[in-house]
UniProtKB/Swiss-Prot annotation:
GO cellular-component term (any): cytoplasm
Family matches, as Gene3D superfamilies: Peptidyl-tRNA hydrolase
PANTHER family cross-referenced by the UniProt entry: PEPTIDYL-TRNA HYDROLASE
Catalytic activity, reaction form: an N-acyl-L-alpha-aminoacyl-tRNA + H2O = an N-acyl-L-amino acid + a tRNA + H(+)
Gene designation: pth
Localization, UniProt: Cytoplasm
The protein's name: Peptidyl-tRNA hydrolase
UniProt keyword annotations, A-Z: Cytoplasm, Hydrolase, RNA-binding, tRNA-binding
């Protein structure tokens, strides 16, 4: 069983913003896996299904990014998921737009949503897929809550598909394989 959480902010006003790239990947995964992420549970929109004999739980926390740990903590404890089967997908301002990075574990890198998750799970030992949103030209809040520039949209669309494929590869072949295949 896997719990896969994409970080983002709820509400129409945040759709398409840099901070919501995790939600975009969950939507792409749901499409690829034939799932609907519409049930409200664990302070999240949830989709449940099966893939290659594994139960898959997709989460879009509705707590706002900075409190994402609350939603993930509830789901992980309910399902008794080992942390190596918890995959978190989120935006990273330190990666160029459209780049993805997969890691087995690590710090928050200053991402407040990840700070919340690490604090509440009491561990940094879970896989994550980071999607580059580029360095802010202005203040950080305006950057992460801003929409992608027209010139960035193709890169992000491709990165969302690639990140979804990377998550599927983690499930099918393990994180080491996915890291060697998708980390550029």
């Amino acid at each position: 069983m896997y719990v896969i959480a994409g970080l983002g902010n709820p509400g129409r006003e945040y759709e398409g913003t840099r901070h919501n790239v995790g939600f975009m990947v969950i939507d792409e995964l749901a499409k690829k896996l034939g799932m609907n992420v519409t049930k409200l549970k664990f302070k999240s929109l949830v989709g449940e299904g099966n893939f290659k004999g594994e139960k898959i739980i997709l989460l879009k926390p509705q707590t706002f990014v900075n409190s994402s740990g609350e939603a993930l903590y509830d789901a992980v404890n309910f399902y008794k998921i080992p942390l190596e089967n918890v995959i978190v997908i989120y935006d990273d301002k330190d990666l160029d737009v459209g780049k993805i990075r997969i890691r087995k574990k690590g710090s928050s890198g200053g991402h407040n949503g990840m700070n919340s998750i690490i604090y509440l799970l009491n561990s940094e030992e879970f896989p994550r897929v980071r999607i580059g949103i580029g360095k802010p030209q202005k203040d950080l809040v305006s950057h992460v809550l801003g929409k992608f520039e027209e010139s960035e949209k193709k890169l992000i669309d491709e990165a969302v598909i690639k990140a979804a494929d990377a998550v599927i590869d983690i499930i099918e072949n393990g994180i080491e394989h996915a890291m060697s295949k998708f980390n550029g």
